[in-house]
Amino acid sequence: MNWLVWALLLCSSAMAHVHRDPTLDHHWDLWKKTYGKQYKEKNEEVARRLIWEKNLKTVTLHNLEHSMGMHSYELGMNHLGDMTSEEVISLMSSLRVPSQWPRNVTYKSDPNQKLPDSMDWREKGCVTEVKYQGACGSCWAFSAVGALEAQVKLKTGKLVSLSAQNLVDCSTAKYGNKGCNGGFMTEAFQYIIDNNGIDSEASYPYKAMDGKCQYDVKNRAATCSRYIELPFGSEEALKEAVANKGPVSVGIDASHSSFFLYKTGVYYDPSCTQNVNHGVLVVGYGNLDGKDYWLVKNSWGLHFGDQGYIRMARNSGNHCGIANYPSYPEI
């Protein structure tokens, strides 16, 4: 457990006796049972209870405002409900945008092209099941393999889960990636290009921790010839790529509690910034109740959002920086 988590727990524990609400004891027990929560020490449970109560208040007030038409999305007390937004970002969102990144925008847009009003690559069988990255900042790896999985399906007709652990263990310092401490999708693609392949998830399973590189060419499940970067901040180019090419890897700002507690609807939080810190996969787009959205696959398990997915506001000023660093691989 890193210093930030300890600091949060200590502060919460010190105040817990003041704020605990005994009327919520039953609901706390139900929530723990639902998500299989167990705590090693009493102090940790007390601290988690305080954070949980704070999040519950946030969810309750937000959903009340939603019922009055003030928000386009609802929140819920999911498996992350006993964590702060700072913890979630520290443990599960470690996108590292290269500081000296020579962007090579090779995508050619066609402004006269008629695009479909909606797209969902899940319906075309190009998206694998939602994964759970755990307490490891490997979001970049899951975003990258998700984009490549779709390209493999489109070329071969076979949908195969690729190994995020292969990237965590092997696409490391040479590429500016740091395993569970973060990385970037284009650098993951570059590793696959240089390595001439990536193993399947079945042969190189995910462990949610850094390990020694164990790539085995005999278990290679995909290759990558190059990757394409889209123009910075262009939602139009992102829509075109998602419509014509397949799922696209992107970075977003996921640093707010409204994000990790999202349940359903079209996510729009005015406090969301252009500073991206989490890698995800855009697998489609559409419109819900008059709100344009991006359909985004996360790697926080099925309990997050809508079965692991979130609909994020589209055509709303590049909300959360979703169009800042889009890229996709080619086989």
From Swiss-Prot:
Signal sequence extent: 1-16
Cellular-component GO terms for this entry: extracellular space; lysosome; phagocytic vesicle
Substrates-to-products reaction catalysed: Similar to cathepsin L, but with much less activity on Z-Phe-Arg-|-NHMec, and more activity on the Z-Val-Val-Arg-|-Xaa compound
Subunit structure as annotated in this protein's UniProt entry: Monomer.
SMART domains listed in its UniProt record: Inhibitor_I29, Pept_C1
EC number: 3.4.22.27
Pfam families listed in its UniProt record: Inhibitor_I29, Peptidase_C1
GO BP terms, alphabetized: antigen processing and presentation of exogenous peptide antigen via MHC class II; proteolysis involved in protein catabolic process
Propeptide: 17-114
CDD domains linked: Peptidase_C1A (cd02248)
Annotated active site: C139, H278, N298
Protein name in the entry: Cathepsin S
The protein's role, per its UniProt record: Thiol protease. Key protease responsible for the removal of the invariant chain from MHC class II molecules and MHC class II antigen presentation. The bond-specificity of this proteinase is in part similar to the specificities of cathepsin L.
Membership in a protein family: Belongs to the peptidase C1 family.
